[in-house]
């Protein structure tokens, strides 16, 4: 009996990852399993990053996840040290006088004028 290789489901487009990899002149041929492995690794990385970001939002009793939560997750988690120089370039969304997070601007209909 010969078994067919099981197809691995990923949430990121394998064909696009392969195309990105091949666009680099330093990379020659790409094995068939490589983009799939990269897609799965990217998926696991994103799950970890999002979970840490959500934890930051929960610790601050926030109902919404904001960029400041992502920044704090990167700064406080050793696993994401390689992202620290990227997030440090972005300002915090914290009001300096009160230390509270800025409220997002409300979108929607304007109140009726009398």
Curated annotation (Swiss-Prot):
Source organism, top-level taxon: Eukaryota
Segments crossing the lipid bilayer: none
Residues in the signal sequence: none
Cited Pfam families: CBFD_NFYB_HMF
Places the protein is found: Nucleus
GO terms, biological process: DNA replication; transcription by RNA polymerase II
Main location: nucleus
Region span, Disordered: 91-114
Keywords of this entry: DNA replication, Nucleus
GO function terms (MF aspect): core promoter sequence-specific DNA binding; protein heterodimerization activity; RNA polymerase II general transcription initiation factor activity
InterPro entries on file: CBFA_NFYB_domain (IPR003958), Histone-fold (IPR009072), Transcr_DNA_Rep_Reg (IPR050568)
GO CC field: negative cofactor 2 complex; nucleus
Further details from the record: In eukaryotes there are five DNA polymerases: alpha, beta, gamma, delta, and epsilon which are responsible for different reactions of DNA synthesis.
Subunit structure: Heterotetramer. Consists of four subunits: POL2, DPB2, DPB3 and DPB4.
Function statement: As accessory component of the DNA polymerase epsilon (DNA polymerase II) participates in chromosomal DNA replication.
Descriptive protein name: DNA polymerase epsilon subunit C
Organism in which the protein naturally occurs: Yarrowia lipolytica (strain CLIB 122 / E 150)
High-level lineage: Eukaryota, Fungi, Dikarya, Ascomycota, Saccharomycotina
